[in-house]
């Protein structure tokens, strides 16, 4: 079966607890960011339209993180003209096929999102408007819907990867910094950065 719509790139694909995959937003063949969402069922090889984000929330280069309670947390991103979101983040509930607005993380796109062992999501780095790189991090807590600041990535970076280590620290690798591609990894402690 084929993906509905015009296809997508710069989207997210998140494995749900029931084995299906939620695909959210991205850029279509017309070079326009979308608000669409679809669910792929690998057991049946079928696609089903899911509730879309509000049209004003169409985006690409965002993150989508599966939470321990089965919801998906969608944060940040930008539109095709480079406008970086500064509004709410979003929670998708697959049991009700619905979206709920959550607290803003400020302007952040091309960032990383790492689920912590305590259920919070660490959002790190990325970029803000006018191409300004972001060094800061923030925690989203799904238990109460709040966002709290974390430490800084050194140097600021976008397009990097972030992996939770058994110690609770996060390894950031690669990405782009002010001088181009970064070759040095960083072990990031959620409240402080260490080289």
Q: For the regions a protein language model found, what residue spans apply to each?
A:
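Kelch-like beta-propeller repeat domains
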Residues: 1-195
């Amino acid at each position: 079966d084929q993906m509905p719509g015009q296809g997508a790139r710069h989207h997210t694909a998140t494995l749900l607890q029931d084995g299906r995959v939620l695909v959210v937003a991205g850029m279509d063949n017309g070079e326009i960011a979308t608000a669409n969402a679809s669910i792929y069922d690998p057991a049946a090889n079928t696609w089903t339209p899911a509730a879309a984000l509000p049209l004003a929330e169409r985006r690409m280069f965002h993150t989508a993180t599966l939470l321990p309670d089965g919801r998906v947390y969608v944060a940040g991103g930008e539109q095709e003209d480079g406008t970086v979101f500064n509004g709410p983040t979003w929670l998708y509930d697959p049991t009700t096929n619905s979206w709920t607005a959550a607290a803003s993380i400020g302007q952040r796109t091309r960032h990383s999102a790492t689920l912590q062992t305590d259920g919070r999501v660490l959002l790190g780095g990325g970029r803000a408007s006018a191409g300004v790189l972001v060094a800061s991090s923030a925690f989203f807590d799904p238990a109460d819907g709040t966002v709290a600041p974390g430490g800084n990535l050194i140097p600021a970076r976008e397009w990097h990867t972030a992996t939770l280590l058994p110690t609770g620290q996060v390894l950031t690798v690669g990405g782009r910094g002010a001088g181009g591609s970064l070759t040095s990894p960083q072990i990031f402690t959620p409240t402080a950065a260490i080289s």
